[in-house]
Amino acid sequence: MCIRDRWSRCRNDYDAIIYVASWPAGRRDVWRTLLRARAIENQAYVLGVNRTGDDPRLHYSGDSAVIGCKGETLAEAGEGQRLLTARLDMDELRRFREKFPAWRDADDFDLK
């Protein structure tokens, strides 16, 4: 399995993307929605790791999750700190990418 940063999303040479974030509890629905969207648009597994706890003005709920390549939730922490485990099925990912080869319609470019 290869893990790349989000700027190489059109290359199809990665299988999972890790997002580390500090989304406050008041925006937890946005966090969950964006994780699913990133998995679908990149045709990759997404591992979302979000902050927990409080600071003087905000509460951070966690809501870390593992999302499948079709946007389905494979594991979810809910509120607070949790250890998540999930099986990332590379055969399923390959079949999905072959059935929907959207990555082939990408423009490869460099930002300078």
Report residues per predicted region.
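Generic detector of short, aliphatic-rich beta-strand segments that form the cores of beta-sheets
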Residues: 1-2, 86
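Active-site beta-loop-alpha substructure in enzyme catalytic cores
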Residues: 3-42, 46-48
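C-terminal beta-strand edge segments of enzyme domains
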Residues: 51-112
